[in-house]
A protein has these predicted regions:
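Active-site-proximal helix/loop segments of hydrolytic enzymes
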Residues: 1-134
Length: 134
């Protein structure tokens, strides 16, 4: 289990029930791109002890947050980055949104530097909307 996933549990005790409702990982990139996106898992993703709707719920939350961040910042809203497996998702007990917000080696950098409050608020609003709907 990824150490970060243990934060979903009281006192990091993974033998307990999780006390988090959602997990959001925030990442920025480099490599010539622009905009905001999220990692989306494929529908064939399966984990022992994880609910059958984990992929659907995680992808839904990522999509909502992605829309909110793009609207709040003017960053272009990119399609999800599809992957069949990502270690951070491994054994996560709650829906997870792995966000890719902006690129440090493009004009996105000025938005990341000047709009961090807006980005944080958009992420919070996205999680809130997701939780209200689920």
């Amino acid at each position: 289990m990824d150490k970060r996933v243990s934060y979903c549990f009281p006192n990091n005790d993974t033998t307990s029930n999780p006390d988090a409702a959602a997990y959001v990982c925030i990442h920025s990139n480099a490599g010539g791109g622009r905009g905001t996106s999220y990692i989306a898992l494929g529908t064939d993703y399966e984990q022992k002890f994880i609910g059958s709707d984990f992929v659907e719920k995680s992808n839904e939350m990522g999509n909502i947050i992605n829309q909110k961040v793009a609207a709040a910042t003017g960053l272009s809203q990119n399609s999800p980055i599809n992957t069949p497996y990502l270690i951070l998702f491994n054994k996560c007990p709650v829906p997870i949104a792995y966000m890719e917000i902006g690129f440090y080696d493009s004009s996105d950098l000025s938005i990341l530097q000047s709009s961090s409050d807006e980005i944080g608020k958009a992420i919070a609003e996205g999680v809130d909307e997701y939780l209200k709907n689920n």
